[in-house]
Amino acid sequence: MRNTRQITKAMKMISAARLRRAQERALSGRPYAQMLTNVLKSLVSRAEIFDPETGAPRHPLLAQRPEKNILVIVVTADRGLAGAFNANIVKAAARFLAANEGKNIDIEAAGRKGRDFLRRRFPTATPEQVERAGAVQIVGEHIGVLGKLQFEYVRDFSESVIDRYTKGEIDSVYVLYNEFKSVIAQRLVVEKVLPIEEIGEKTIAQAEELTKEEREMRAEAAKSAGVSLGEADTAEMDRRAAAFATAQVDYIYEQPPAELFRDLLPKYVAVQIYRSMLESTAAEHAARMTAMDSATSNADEMIDKLTLAMNRARQAKITKEIIEIVSGAAAQ
């Protein structure tokens, strides 16, 4: 039991260190995402995004169709020992699928745990089936990429998603992930990425906050691991990012609006998917740190109980031997 306690305590400290790095990556990407959003909002407010004659959007990612074929990106972890982190995500995925029963749903599974769960329930599409959705099926797996996530990988992945949307194979794209705010402020989110209904406004289809008990457990785990409970102090950076490209002036763009849309909208989609994966990774480490802290506390309690039981048994044995010695001496 003491060996188990040492293992869980070490895993808690490792998760705390990884949480700090994951949190830094998630926070450092927010100003860029905010600035990109502001540029697009400024461009949309000054350019015609729909053809005045046909009413068609000037970019395919702005097109909206009846939602018959859905792509959902389910972001879980590659490893377990994170409490209910993975279970909560796959349960939310099951609820999302049930709410959209009757529609064709393709699943991109990011993370081994979610992939394993979904594989047991739904078939994996063959290469010739990927181009056409059918009921619920797994069309992609992304295993071992979240721990060392690179934007280049997400960009390539988002290009394949955009290509399917542009061809009309899918009508909407959702990302299901854990949104990280701080160690004790997270929520499970189903976010609509495509179609882009309004630049800069996240369309949350479903959200679940941590319970009070979960927040208290995470707060205790963070304190013992030396991790800050609040959000990192990025107020000045966030303020500058929020003010970027928002001045009420007429910007002069070198490229025509159509070319800017062609360059920026795909990047906007890639950034949204990348951000969701970074947030989920930070949330995963926070959940694992909490789970290992709880396991360490349980091990401490078990060690105390076993030590007490062992001492009582030893004391009873010694007492019995003394009584036997005294009784033998008295009989002589």
Regions found by a protein language model. Give the residues of each.
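C-terminal beta-strand-loop-alpha-helix "lid" module of Rossmann-like NAD(P)-dependent dehydrogenases
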Residues: 1-332
